[in-house]
Amino acid sequence: IWEENEMNTTECIRTRRSIRKFKPDPIDHFLLESIISTASYSPSWKNSQIVRYIAIEDSSILNSIMNNYTPDFNSNIIRQAPMLIAMTFVKGRCGFERDGSFTTKKGDRWQMFDAGIAAQTFCLAAHEAGLGTVIMGIWDEDGITKLLDFPKDQELAALIAIGYPDIHPDAPGRKSVDELLTYR
């Protein structure tokens, strides 16, 4: 759907920003479905594909989240975004053996690891499609879980505001490769 906007991977990664101000234009459902289709290719533990997405457009649900379940700085972002994605993961599949025991010392932390990979892939696919995103991690998990009526086997991993950017911030500073890379 967005062939005219295609960019290479490096350009997509280097130009993506966390967007906190959005235009009011709605997001076409076909476009969102294309982004989700791309994000579905995120790597996951034993290809478990545990991430699920709930697209929230209903103003009464958005208002409830803003007024009751997020701090003001996140509520201000959600207020402007035409859509909010509640990203969940299916519990008990990543990092586990069939008998329910942990495969590694990391235990069930692989669930959030896989959710993080999927969130990044979702945000990069949205950026390539001309949309902006910001991942939010501070919210009332119990309240949002009850409000959105998640299945019992799912857990909220992130809220992602998404829409057409109304700002284009500069890149923040980055650490040098020398600070990030060690050879042994």
Regions found by a protein language model. Give the residues of each.
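C-terminal helix-cap and adjacent tail motif
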Residues: 9-19, 24, 93, 157-184
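Short amphipathic alpha-helical segments
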Residues: 32-37
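Glycine/small-residue-rich phosphate/adenosyl-binding loop
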Residues: 47-115
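Small-aliphatic-rich amphipathic alpha-helix that forms the alpha element of a beta-alpha
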Residues: 39, 85, 103-147
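A glycine-rich helix N-cap at a beta->alpha junction
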Residues: 75-84, 149-171
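Short secondary-structure boundary segments
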Residues: 89, 138, 164
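Short secondary-structure junction motifs
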Residues: 48-51, 131, 157
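Short, Lys/Arg-enriched N-terminal segments with co-localized hydrophobic residues
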Residues: 1-6
